[in-house]
Amino acid sequence: ALMQSGGFRKALLLDGETRSRIYSPKDRKTAFLFGDGGIAAIIEKGDQFEESYFSLNSDGSKESYIKMDAGGYRNPSSVETLKEKVVDEHGNIRTEEHGYMAGADVFNFVLLEIPKDIKSLLAFSNFSTSEIDYFVFHQANSYMNTYLAKKLKLESDKVPTCIEKFGNTSSVSIPLTIVSELQNNLEGNKKILLSGFGVGMSWASTIINMQ
C-alpha cells in the first residue's frame, strides 16, 4: 500500500520468528512442529514488473483455532498464568502464556478455504495454473501441502517444500522456502503464487513476479 501511494519504490523487509519461545517444550502436541528463523527480502516497484494480485481474508469466529490464553492486554501476565498445568490425558504441559493449536480444526479449515482462495485469485487474474512457475505454500504440514497440490492438480516440481529442514517457521516459512529451494531457479522473470494462513484465522494468497 505504501509503495502504491508513490512514496518510495524499494524497501527492505525483515522478518524473524522465535516460535520456540512461544510453545511449551513439554507440550508434545505442538512444540516439535515449529522452528525458529529469519529472513531479509527486497521488495521493489517498477515498470519492468507485471501487475501483482492479492487476496486477503480473515474470520474472527475461528480465533480459538490458534491462540495464547494470557500474557496480553485482555488477560495480563500474572503468577497464575505462568503456572504449568497438565492440559490433557496425554500428560502435555503448558502455561496459559504458551501458544497452542486445535490441530484438527486448523487442518480442516485449510483444506476447505485455501484451494477456494487460490482458485478465486487465479480466476480474478486470468491466469491458469500452467502459467504460474511455482506455488509456494506456508510450511505448516507436509501432508496438508501435498493435499493442496493434488486438489489444484499441480505438478510436484512446481510446489517446493522445506518443512523437513526447518519445521513450521510461521511467517518466515514462505520466503525461507523461496531462498532454500528456489534460489537457483529464479533467473529471468518468474511468476510465483504464494499462499499462507495463520492466527485469526487469517489467510492470503498473492501472485507476484520475481527476478
Describe each PLM feature range.
Residues 1-7, 111, 115, 133-211:
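Claisen-condensing/thiolase-fold acyl-transfer catalytic domains that form or cleave C-C bonds
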Residues 6-38:
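Flexible, glycine-rich active-site loops centered on histidine and acidic residues
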Residues 12-19, 86-91, 144-156:
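Acidic-glycine-rich active-site phosphate/pyrophosphate-binding loop
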Residues 15-21, 57-59, 165-167, 196-201:
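Acidic, glycine-rich active-site loops and adjacent beta-strand->loop/helix elements
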Residues 27-108, 112, 116, 197, ...:
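Condensing-enzyme catalytic core mediating Claisen C-C bond formation in acyl metabolism
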Residues 117-125, 177:
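Stable alpha-helical structural segments in soluble proteins, enriched in small hydrophobic residues
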Residues 126-131:
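Short, surface-exposed connector motifs at secondary-structure boundaries
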